[in-house]
């Protein structure tokens, strides 16, 4: 299933994408899409619904974050070997974990705000893993049983903030730095998350092109690893790192986002995002 939320910010309704790509209204069936709805029981109930029985949503409404109740926004750094190389950093021997503040979460096509002091604003197309059941000290073999589905994430990053110290969070957590969606695609449709093509264009020019097969640590490894250090709860999301092609890595001169730039990004089977960079308005 492809689950989503649509409508004005703060007034989103739950939706479902049918096999023809049409947006269907779920609001007469469920009030919202959150941890209960993406639990195994919740997804089983939703799977019984025939999309053709739901009203078609007219027009092209704004797409919101595809679900609510994100308690933790966990991120993995340098998880593609070529990206580590372009960043001038050693390939990690174990996953690098950091956090993005949940206040940075943004709709998939909403504007990205350039902070007033920003000088090195950058992009990162990533695969997001959405947790569906509590995971604590799980094995790699069982890890994906705790996953509800997958999303597109843009791990927007201010490199000047990020590299001021060994802690990356402040370069990753500004408001609007966490676009998620447009859909939460359940594991019945994404049976193997390690074969997904991914891309990011800047103003129509291809900057990133990769595939999740080149992750250093795959999705099962990441869920199992993170669960050794914190309990993962339904609704938590792990964003899994980015392939090469970020602005910081462009040679000979890095390229950073400026006001007016447009990012278009996506992953195979998970939909696309599009964001315009805008100035901070106070």
Locate each region found by the language model.
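Residue-level recognition of short, solvent-exposed, well-ordered loop/turn junctions
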Residues: 68, 122-124, 233, 258-259
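A structural-propensity feature for long, helix-poor, extended segments
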Residues: 107-128
């Amino acid at each position: 299933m492809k689950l989503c939320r649509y409508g004005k910010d703060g007034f989103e309704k739950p939706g479902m994408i049918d096999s023809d790509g049409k947006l269907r209204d779920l609001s007469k069936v469920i009030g919202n899409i959150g941890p209960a709805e993406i639990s195994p029981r919740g997804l089983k109930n939703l799977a019984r619904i025939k999309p053709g029985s739901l009203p078609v949503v007219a027009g092209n409404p704004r797409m919101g974050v595809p679900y609510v109740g994100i308690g933790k926004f966990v991120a993995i750094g340098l998880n593609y070997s070529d990206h580590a190389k372009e960043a001038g950093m050693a390939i990690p021997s174990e996953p690098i974990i950091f956090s993005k503040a949940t206040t940075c979460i943004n709709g998939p096509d909403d504007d990205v705000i350039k902070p007033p002091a920003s000088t090195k604003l950058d992009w990162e197309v990533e695969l997001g893993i959405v947790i569906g059941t509590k995971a604590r000290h799980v094995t790699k073999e069982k890890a994906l049983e705790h996953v509800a589905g997958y999303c597109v994430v843009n791990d927007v990053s201010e490199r000047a903030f990020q590299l001021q110290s060994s802690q990356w969070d402040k370069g990753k957590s500004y408001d609007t730095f966490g676009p998620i969606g447009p859909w939460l695609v359940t594991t019945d449709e994404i049976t193997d998350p390690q074969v997904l093509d991914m891309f990011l264009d800047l103003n129509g020019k291809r900057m990133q092109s990769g595939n999740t097969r080149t992750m250093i640590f795959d999705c099962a490894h990441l869920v199992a690893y993170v669960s050794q250090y914190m309990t993962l709860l339904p609704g938590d999301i792990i964003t899994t790192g980015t392939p090469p092609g970020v602005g910081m890595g462009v040679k000979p001169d890095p390229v950073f986002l400026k006001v007016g730039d447009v990012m278009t990004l996506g992953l195979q089977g998970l939909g696309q995002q599009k964001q315009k960079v805008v100035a901070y308005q106070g």
